[in-house]
Amino acid sequence: MSERRVGYAPGVFDLFHIGHLNVLRNSKQFCDYLIVGVVSDEMAQRNKGNRPVVPHEERLEIVEHIKFVDEAVVEDVPHKLEMWERLKFDVIIKGDDWKGTDKGDKLESDFAAVGVDVAYLPYTKRTSSTMLRRLLEREIEGF
């Protein structure tokens, strides 16, 4: 009997929407056991320049209750390799908006060095957290 293949899908998962659900559903094709890393508020602010609308404790609870997710953890470190050191996953799953970018190339290089595959999933163009955030900001300004 072979060992299970562990996947890791990190993300902010703010203002949870269909794109997030698609990522989690489709991530299961790459692994037997899916761990989702919910990026902490502090790391999200550091990486994206603004704090999520929904606090990470609530985002974590939402993700934990998605049937495709076997385990959810808070990602509270600046480098994905630090999460690998904790969790020892076999494949990291990212949106294909990373593919061919400097950050995607670095991710592939870093993980190749420790024998971890990088899998990409298509980005859902219909709905994004950025779009939802902009709509909310416009509504609040006009309120």
Segments and roles (model prediction):
Residues 1-143:
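Nucleotidyltransferase catalytic core that binds NTPs
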